[in-house]
Each structure stands twice: as structure tokens, then as C-alpha cells.
Amino acid sequence: MQFKKTLVRLLLFLFPFSAAAQTTYLPLGDKANILIERLEIKSKNDSSLNYSKTRPFSRQNIVIAITQLNKRGVNDLKLSKVDQYNLRSLLMNNIEFGADKSIFRSKKTVGKKFYQTPANFYEVHIKDFDLVINPVIQAIISKESNNDQALYLNTRGLTLRGRIANKIGFHAYVTDNQEKDPLYVRDWVNRRKAVPGQGFYKPFKTTGYDYFDARGYFTFNATRYIDVTFGYDRNFIGNGYRSLFLGDGNSNNLFLKMNTRIWKFNYQNLFMELHSAEIPGGDKLLPKKYAAMHHLDVSVTKWLNIGLFEGVIFGRKDHFDFGYLNPIIFYRSIEQQNGSFDNSIVGLDAKANFDRKLQVYGQLSLDEFLLGEITKNRGYWGNKIGIQIGAKYIDAFGISNLDLQIEHNRVRPFTYSHRDSVANYTHYNQPLAHPLGANFKEFIGIARYQPAPKWLSVLKLIYYQQGRDSSARVFGNNIFLPNISPNRVGDYGYSIGSGWKTNVFYASFLLSYEWKENLFIELNAVYRKQDTKTPPLTSANTSVISFGVRWNVGRREFDY
């Protein structure tokens, strides 16, 4: 409660509501994200889309950028018919930010008031007020090879967004969900005491889970260059499929976000209220911890972007440390002033676009390290480092809308952990960055092909090797444990894969058909094989076939 009061007072003091036009944001799983990535690479010499590391994307900024790109013409960007279809769909799904709304009118409405455009169930666009309401439905049934029980995912709810007086934007997403997951996911839930990507949950019919997913936020522009968002949702920092700074696979959290975009700079400050690993039952208040992060993007050229990241996780007795509200100074100096070394992480990222077809990106995450120990190569436990490198190749081999992506992630043991378990880099029993935690190396390959406007196929291959902790010794995989004695035994001999070595191969194939706008019929197949290479040797193979529909909601995946 104290954290919420602090943020509200800060908003009122720093940013009086005399704002200009404002925005809402594309959901992280929105279909338009793929198109935005393609347009960014195709428009190599146009920097209007060159700030794609901090997500979700601003609807207003995307529409403005696309409008600017449209002035260059389809031939200049070499857009395929599928791209043009997706571009029209993006503008229709963000109709409140477009100049001409009449071009998207439905030929046939429902009861004259509903589906005035194909994208939205109900919408109002009048002076000083915009409102868009859509249902959210997902119904998926699955069959697992080594499981006699039927698997399913059932989601019902609604989503809405709007603007008031062209000064305040708002968004809400509320769903009720029941799911029964594959056996490897249930094992994950039993170990973590959390449902992937969700917060509080209840058992449902013995082996299922029941949870309520509610998100929402308010936005406004403090000045022409500063966007402010206050709400309860998720954020993502990076250009990869995964992130070593802040991923989107964890639970929603309360946050205040300030994004400053001017000249060649995009600077984001993010303050979050999180929950520690302890999840008591009943109606008890959950113990809280806090995070303060900032990320600076610099467009060195129109095709090269370099970023700096810094974040700190700190535990206080249910109150926010005001020192961390400073949006500029390095957090380590604040820790020293406070007499407390909290869990601080710094990072560097980069992204470069080449030849309108290729993007190369990467991240370097530094939790702690000693340069002398790195050169000695003795496996010092305190060298807590993560590295990501990847590439995207669009219209691969001259085939329109065939997009390939490869990515490699490696994180050393004990990265993201801390001597104080409250300050580990986690939220609601889930990692804040990469879903595997630490002590792993991972290889990802993704192929997306959209041969026609309504059809999409996605092949995904993931292989990772992880050194897991045993019952007798900790090897730096479990980032929830304090990284001090007796959990950590010794200072040396730790490398990626140390411990109970486990290899996992994951493959999935998705075939998706968009029957109506934002209504997808999908068939998905998953194969997963897990082998332990350290005695006692074990092996577990599973395959899952799924079929279902989803409407105005992103796909739910367990790809690890």
C-alpha cells in the first residue's frame, strides 16, 4: 500500500495532467509484433521504428511510424501482398489513432452497434472519448502421449481500451482461466509452487489449475517527449525471443513506467512492486520486494542501436526506498549511500540491421564479476554473467514472408541469485529474466512462414543443457536460494553445466488460420525429450497434440 501511495504522489507532483495526446500499448503476444519486426528490418535507413527493445509497443507511435513509412510507398519497402494485408490489419486494430476511420467500416454490422469494424466487437469514437471493447475466448484441447487424462485450456473474459479528452489512456484485460497442463509443466508447478506466467492460483479438479488474470493501466504524456504508465501488467526488454534483462514469462506486477524519447535517445525508467518466493496460503498478505530499472537506447546510426541497462532488486519491510526513484544516477552509488548492497545488475545490448533482410542482436548481463578471476579461468562462483547473441533473417532465400531466427543464450551459475533470498531476481516464484534461471546454455531456432494473408506456420526448435542442483549440493541453478554457505559449497569449480547435468530438446509446429479478424483456429504439435547425463540417469519423452480456437488473446506456450 505504501508503494502505491508513493507512486501516486510522485505522479501528481512531477506530472500535472496538462498532457498532450496519449497512447495505449499493443499486448506482448499481439500478432502485429511480427509485422513491426519485419518493417523495422526492411526500413533499414529509417529510424522511426528503431526503438524496439522496450516492449510493449506504443500503439500511437507505431501508427505514426507506419504512416511515415507509407509515404515512401510499397515498392520502396518491397512489401508483399501478405505484408500489405497485415499492415491494413494493424491500422484497423488501432483505429483510434488513424486519421480516416471510415475506410475500415464493416459491410455488415451486428445490430447496427456491434462490429462497426471487423476488428472490434463494440467501439465508440467521439470528441474527447474513444472506447474499444472485445471478448476474450480461448478453448484448446490436447492429448499427451504418456498421459491418459485429457488436457485443456479454457479462457473467458474481455478486454477494453480507450482515451479520455485526448489526455488519458486506459486499458484493462480480465479473464477467468482453467487449465490442465502436460506432465512436465505440472512438475514445474510442483517444484516452483507457481503456474507459469501467472500469480495466485487454486487447484482445479485435482490436477488442473484455476486462476484469474487481471491486467490494466493508465497512460498519459507528461510532455511531448515523456510517456508515463501506471498499472499492473508485464514488460519486456530486448530484441530476442528471450531476455537476460527482463522477460515476459513471469507474473504481472504493479509498476510505474516513464519513457522519454527525444532525438536519438529512448530512455525508460521502470519501478516495480514484486513478491518474494514465500507464498503463504489463505488470505495473508504476501511479503513484498521492489525493483528499479532503467534502459537507455541510443541510435548511433539509422541502422545501429546500442543500449545500456541497470536494475536493482531490493527487499525492505514493505516500503519502497526513495533513493531508487532517482532516474539518472547509477544504483550502486545509492546502495553505498544506504549502507546496503542490494542485488544490482548492469547490462549492454546492441542491434544492427543489414541489407533490409538481416538483423543481428545481443545482450550482455553482468550480475557480479572479478576480471582477475575471469582470466585465471578457475570457475569462480562470483563471475555471474549472461550472454545472448541472435539473428533474424526475413524473406529468407528470396521467399516472401519466410522469416528465420536463431538465438543462443548462456548464463553462468548463481547469476540472478543473491546472498539475501528476498533480493533474488524473481517475482512470484518465477525468474524475472530467462525462464531457466541460471547455469544453462540454450540454442533456439524459429522459422515463421505466412504463405497467404490468413495462414501462418511456425516451427520452433530449442535445445538446452543445464546443471541442476542435487539434494546434496547447490550448483547455482536455483536462483531462489541464498548464494552463501551452507547452500554454496566452495568458491571455485563452477561452470555452465556443473551439477546434475540435464539436456532438453523441445520442438513444436504450429499451423494457424485466422478465420475472422483476431479469431484463430490452430493446430499445434509439441515433442519434448529430457535426459539427465549425471547418475542417476533418467529419461522422459513426451509429445502433445493440441487443437483449439483463440479470440483476442495471445498464445500460451510452455517452451522450455
Predicted regions and their residues:
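Active-site-adjacent bridging/hinge elements
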Residues: I36-L39, I226-D233, Y361, S365, ...
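Short N-terminal segments immediately surrounding and downstream of signal-peptide cleavage
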Residues: T23-E40
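Exposed, low-structure sequence patches enriched in small/polar residues
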Residues: Y211, L304-V312, K317-Y560
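Outer-membrane beta-barrel channel domains
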Residues: D30, N45-K53, S58-Q60, I64-N305, ...
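Bacterial Sec-dependent N-terminal signal peptides
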Residues: M1-T24
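An exposure/low-complexity boundary signal
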Residues: S18, T229-R234, A507-F509
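Generic structural marker for isolated residues within well-ordered, non-membrane alpha-helices
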Residues: I36, R215, I444
